Amino acid sequence: MKINKYIDHTLLKADSVQSQIDQLLSEAKTHEFASVCVNPGWVSYCAEALKGSDVKVCTVVGFPLGATTPETKAFETKNAIENGADEIDMVLNIGKLKQGDYQAVEDDVRAVVEASGDKLVKVIIEACLLTDDEKIKACQLSVAAGADFVKTSTGFSTGGATISDVKLMRQTVGPEIGVKAAGGARSLEDALAFIEAGATRIGTSAGVKIINGEAVKGGY
Protein backbone atom coordinates (compact mmCIF):
# COMPACT_ATOMS: atom_id res chain seq x y z
CA MET A 1 0.00 0.00 0.00
CA LYS A 2 1.34 3.43 -0.95
CA ILE A 3 0.19 5.39 2.09
CA ASN A 4 1.58 8.62 0.60
CA LYS A 5 -1.08 8.55 -2.13
CA TYR A 6 -3.79 8.73 0.52
CA ILE A 7 -2.49 11.95 2.07
CA ASP A 8 -3.73 15.49 1.51
CA HIS A 9 -0.73 17.36 2.96
CA THR A 10 -2.46 20.19 4.78
CA LEU A 11 -1.68 23.72 5.95
CA LEU A 12 -4.79 25.78 6.70
CA LYS A 13 -3.65 27.94 9.63
CA ALA A 14 -4.51 31.63 9.43
CA ASP A 15 -0.91 32.64 10.15
CA SER A 16 0.71 30.49 7.46
CA VAL A 17 3.58 32.27 5.72
CA GLN A 18 5.29 31.61 2.40
CA SER A 19 8.25 29.76 3.91
CA GLN A 20 5.83 27.27 5.48
CA ILE A 21 3.95 26.86 2.21
CA ASP A 22 7.27 26.29 0.44
CA GLN A 23 8.11 23.55 2.93
CA LEU A 24 4.67 21.98 2.42
CA LEU A 25 5.17 21.99 -1.35
CA SER A 26 8.67 20.56 -1.12
CA GLU A 27 7.51 17.74 1.15
CA ALA A 28 4.53 16.99 -1.07
CA LYS A 29 6.71 16.71 -4.16
CA THR A 30 9.40 14.67 -2.41
CA HIS A 31 6.94 12.18 -0.95
CA GLU A 32 4.45 12.31 -3.85
CA PHE A 33 1.42 13.01 -1.69
CA ALA A 34 -2.02 13.08 -3.30
CA SER A 35 -2.38 16.83 -2.81
CA VAL A 36 -1.54 19.89 -0.82
CA CYS A 37 -4.56 21.41 0.92
CA VAL A 38 -4.19 25.16 1.40
CA ASN A 39 -6.33 28.25 1.89
CA PRO A 40 -7.61 29.92 -1.30
CA GLY A 41 -5.10 32.76 -1.13
CA TRP A 42 -2.28 30.27 -1.72
CA VAL A 43 -3.84 28.33 -4.61
CA SER A 44 -2.24 30.17 -7.52
CA TYR A 45 1.18 30.07 -5.84
CA CYS A 46 0.90 26.34 -5.21
CA ALA A 47 -0.45 25.60 -8.68
CA GLU A 48 2.55 27.32 -10.25
CA ALA A 49 4.99 25.53 -7.94
CA LEU A 50 3.47 22.11 -8.63
CA LYS A 51 3.45 22.35 -12.43
CA GLY A 52 4.85 19.15 -13.88
CA SER A 53 4.21 17.11 -10.73
CA ASP A 54 1.36 14.72 -9.97
CA VAL A 55 0.54 16.50 -6.70
CA LYS A 56 -2.89 18.12 -6.85
CA VAL A 57 -3.87 21.49 -5.41
CA CYS A 58 -6.76 21.21 -2.96
CA THR A 59 -8.44 24.20 -1.33
CA VAL A 60 -11.34 24.99 0.97
CA VAL A 61 -14.69 26.69 0.37
CA GLY A 62 -17.16 28.03 2.95
CA PHE A 63 -14.42 27.30 5.44
CA PRO A 64 -14.47 26.63 8.34
CA LEU A 65 -18.10 27.30 9.35
CA GLY A 66 -20.07 26.41 6.23
CA ALA A 67 -22.39 29.32 6.97
CA THR A 68 -21.97 31.40 3.82
CA THR A 69 -24.55 31.42 1.03
CA PRO A 70 -24.56 28.92 -1.86
CA GLU A 71 -23.80 31.82 -4.21
CA THR A 72 -20.72 32.76 -2.18
CA LYS A 73 -19.52 29.16 -2.13
CA ALA A 74 -20.04 28.87 -5.88
CA PHE A 75 -18.02 32.04 -6.48
CA GLU A 76 -15.22 30.81 -4.20
CA THR A 77 -15.18 27.54 -6.12
CA LYS A 78 -14.97 29.16 -9.55
CA ASN A 79 -12.30 31.57 -8.37
CA ALA A 80 -10.23 28.76 -6.85
CA ILE A 81 -10.41 26.72 -10.05
CA GLU A 82 -9.44 29.74 -12.15
CA ASN A 83 -6.41 30.05 -9.87
CA GLY A 84 -5.45 26.42 -10.43
CA ALA A 85 -7.30 24.33 -7.84
CA ASP A 86 -7.86 20.67 -8.71
CA GLU A 87 -9.95 19.72 -5.68
CA ILE A 88 -12.50 21.59 -3.56
CA ASP A 89 -13.15 20.77 0.11
CA MET A 90 -16.38 22.58 0.98
CA VAL A 91 -18.16 22.85 4.33
CA LEU A 92 -21.88 22.12 4.14
CA ASN A 93 -24.40 24.31 5.94
CA ILE A 94 -24.36 22.63 9.34
CA GLY A 95 -27.08 24.77 10.91
CA LYS A 96 -29.50 24.10 8.06
CA LEU A 97 -28.78 20.38 8.39
CA LYS A 98 -29.44 20.36 12.13
CA GLN A 99 -32.76 22.18 11.73
CA GLY A 100 -33.89 19.71 9.08
CA ASP A 101 -33.79 22.06 6.09
CA TYR A 102 -32.48 19.29 3.88
CA GLN A 103 -33.33 20.82 0.52
CA ALA A 104 -31.27 23.89 1.40
CA VAL A 105 -28.34 21.66 2.37
CA GLU A 106 -28.53 19.70 -0.87
CA ASP A 107 -28.86 22.88 -2.93
CA ASP A 108 -25.83 24.34 -1.14
CA VAL A 109 -23.66 21.36 -2.06
CA ARG A 110 -25.04 21.25 -5.59
CA ALA A 111 -24.08 24.91 -6.12
CA VAL A 112 -20.45 24.00 -5.49
CA VAL A 113 -20.63 20.79 -7.53
CA GLU A 114 -22.05 22.68 -10.51
CA ALA A 115 -19.45 25.45 -10.16
CA SER A 116 -16.64 22.90 -9.98
CA GLY A 117 -17.07 21.46 -13.47
CA ASP A 118 -14.97 18.30 -13.64
CA LYS A 119 -12.98 19.05 -10.48
CA LEU A 120 -13.23 16.87 -7.39
CA VAL A 121 -15.61 18.03 -4.63
CA LYS A 122 -15.30 16.82 -1.04
CA VAL A 123 -18.05 17.78 1.41
CA ILE A 124 -16.99 18.41 5.00
CA ILE A 125 -19.85 17.38 7.29
CA GLU A 126 -18.11 18.40 10.58
CA ALA A 127 -19.01 15.11 12.22
CA CYS A 128 -18.05 16.24 15.72
CA LEU A 129 -21.10 18.54 15.74
CA LEU A 130 -23.58 15.95 14.47
CA THR A 131 -25.57 13.01 15.80
CA ASP A 132 -25.16 9.72 13.95
CA ASP A 133 -28.49 10.26 12.21
CA GLU A 134 -27.33 13.72 11.11
CA LYS A 135 -24.04 12.28 9.84
CA ILE A 136 -25.96 9.76 7.74
CA LYS A 137 -28.26 12.46 6.37
CA ALA A 138 -25.33 14.75 5.58
CA CYS A 139 -23.66 11.99 3.58
CA GLN A 140 -26.87 11.10 1.75
CA LEU A 141 -27.52 14.73 0.79
CA SER A 142 -23.91 15.18 -0.36
CA VAL A 143 -24.13 12.14 -2.63
CA ALA A 144 -27.52 13.25 -3.97
CA ALA A 145 -26.01 16.64 -4.84
CA GLY A 146 -23.23 15.01 -6.86
CA ALA A 147 -20.26 15.22 -4.49
CA ASP A 148 -17.26 12.95 -5.07
CA PHE A 149 -16.24 12.62 -1.42
CA VAL A 150 -17.53 13.14 2.09
CA LYS A 151 -15.04 14.40 4.68
CA THR A 152 -15.20 14.16 8.46
CA SER A 153 -13.88 17.46 9.73
CA THR A 154 -12.45 20.93 9.19
CA GLY A 155 -9.89 20.55 11.96
CA PHE A 156 -11.17 23.84 13.38
CA SER A 157 -14.09 22.60 15.50
CA THR A 158 -14.39 20.42 18.61
CA GLY A 159 -12.87 17.25 17.18
CA GLY A 160 -11.34 15.45 14.22
CA ALA A 161 -11.92 12.14 12.50
CA THR A 162 -12.80 9.02 14.46
CA ILE A 163 -12.80 5.41 13.31
CA SER A 164 -16.50 5.07 14.08
CA ASP A 165 -17.36 8.12 11.98
CA VAL A 166 -15.33 6.88 9.02
CA LYS A 167 -17.02 3.47 9.22
CA LEU A 168 -20.48 5.07 9.39
CA MET A 169 -19.74 7.39 6.48
CA ARG A 170 -18.39 4.53 4.36
CA GLN A 171 -21.44 2.38 5.13
CA THR A 172 -23.70 5.28 4.16
CA VAL A 173 -22.10 6.31 0.87
CA GLY A 174 -21.19 2.85 -0.41
CA PRO A 175 -18.07 1.87 -2.35
CA GLU A 176 -18.14 4.46 -5.15
CA ILE A 177 -17.85 7.70 -3.14
CA GLY A 178 -14.63 8.78 -1.44
CA VAL A 179 -14.32 9.21 2.33
CA LYS A 180 -11.72 11.60 3.74
CA ALA A 181 -10.62 11.34 7.37
CA ALA A 182 -9.28 14.69 8.53
CA GLY A 183 -7.75 15.87 11.76
CA GLY A 184 -7.46 12.53 13.54
CA ALA A 185 -4.36 10.77 12.19
CA ARG A 186 -1.48 11.05 14.66
CA SER A 187 0.59 8.07 13.53
CA LEU A 188 1.06 5.59 10.72
CA GLU A 189 -1.08 3.18 12.74
CA ASP A 190 -3.88 5.76 12.91
CA ALA A 191 -3.73 6.35 9.17
CA LEU A 192 -3.82 2.63 8.41
CA ALA A 193 -6.75 2.18 10.80
CA PHE A 194 -8.69 4.93 9.02
CA ILE A 195 -7.99 3.29 5.67
CA GLU A 196 -9.11 -0.07 7.05
CA ALA A 197 -12.32 1.63 8.25
CA GLY A 198 -13.02 2.91 4.73
CA ALA A 199 -11.08 6.14 4.23
CA THR A 200 -9.68 6.76 0.76
CA ARG A 201 -7.96 10.02 1.70
CA ILE A 202 -6.29 11.27 4.89
CA GLY A 203 -6.13 15.00 5.65
CA THR A 204 -3.18 15.83 7.88
CA SER A 205 -0.48 18.42 8.51
CA ALA A 206 1.88 15.65 9.59
CA GLY A 207 2.09 13.52 6.46
CA VAL A 208 5.87 13.25 6.53
CA LYS A 209 5.99 12.02 10.11
CA ILE A 210 3.14 9.60 9.47
CA ILE A 211 4.75 7.92 6.48
CA ASN A 212 8.05 7.78 8.38
CA GLY A 213 6.35 6.04 11.29
CA GLU A 214 7.02 8.87 13.74
CA ALA A 215 4.65 9.94 16.52
CA VAL A 216 2.80 13.23 16.00
CA LYS A 217 2.07 15.68 18.79
CA GLY A 218 -0.85 18.05 18.26
CA GLY A 219 -1.50 19.63 14.88
CA TYR A 220 -4.17 18.84 12.33
Curated annotation (Swiss-Prot):
GO MF entries: deoxyribose-phosphate aldolase activity
Pathway(s) the chain acts in: Carbohydrate degradation; 2-deoxy-D-ribose 1-phosphate degradation; D-glyceraldehyde 3-phosphate and acetaldehyde from 2-deoxy-alpha-D-ribose 1-phosphate: step 2/2
InterPro entries, alphabetized: Aldolase_TIM, DeoC, DeoC/FbaB/LacD_aldolase, DeoC_typeI
GO annotations of cellular component type: cytoplasm
Keywords: Cytoplasm, Lyase, Schiff base
Job of this protein: Catalyzes a reversible aldol reaction between acetaldehyde and D-glyceraldehyde 3-phosphate to generate 2-deoxy-D-ribose 5-phosphate.
Name the record gives this protein: Deoxyribose-phosphate aldolase
Protein encoded by which gene: deoC
